[in-house]
């Protein structure tokens, strides 16, 4: 509420402010998560998404390929998904192998995994430590998306 006061002489009148301005607080910041509770990475201009999931106990990285809505699996025929991560200030490359998910058609996979890599075990403790780029070929087109955590 806003109120103003001042002196204007003998015949001053006081008028209370009856209308206030309501200001809404912004909604709390929410991270975008995919159907497997992982971090979403945009591929192309919302054409596809990659969902990056990290299991801290096993140090296993899983990338799910999702459709434009980031809700449904999108099985692809890629041999792998390339991941470049920044570890100790250096860019390191990793390949995640296809592990077809339930319902993926023969010869295609919507899930790609990397388990037991010593560099990941030593340096990545949770999802927030993942900084880098996902690279994948879907159909005949190459896609790249940044893993970034906005706070």
Each model region followed by its residue ranges:
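Sec-dependent N-terminal signal peptides
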Residues: 1-3
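Intrinsically disordered, low-complexity terminal tails/loops enriched in metal-binding residues
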Residues: 5-151
């Amino acid at each position: 509420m806003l109120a103003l006061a001042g002196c204007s002489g003998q015949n001053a009148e006081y008028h209370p402010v009856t209308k206030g301005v309501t200001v809404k607080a912004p909604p709390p910041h929410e991270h975008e998560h995919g159907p497997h509770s992982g971090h979403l990475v945009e591929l192309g201009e919302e054409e596809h998404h990659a969902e990056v999931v990290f299991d801290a106990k096993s140090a296993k990285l899983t990338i799910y390929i999702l459709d434009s809505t980031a809700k449904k699996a999108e099985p692809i025929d890629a041999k792998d998904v390339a991941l470049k991560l920044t570890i100790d200030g250096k860019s390191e490359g990793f390949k995640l192998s296809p592990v077809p998910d339930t319902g993926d058609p023969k010869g295609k996979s919507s899930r790609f995994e990397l388990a037991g890599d010593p560099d990941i075990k030593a340096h990545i403790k949770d999802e927030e430590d993942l900084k880098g780029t996902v690279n994948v070929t879907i159909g005949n087109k190459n896609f790249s998306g940044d893993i970034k955590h906005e706070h």
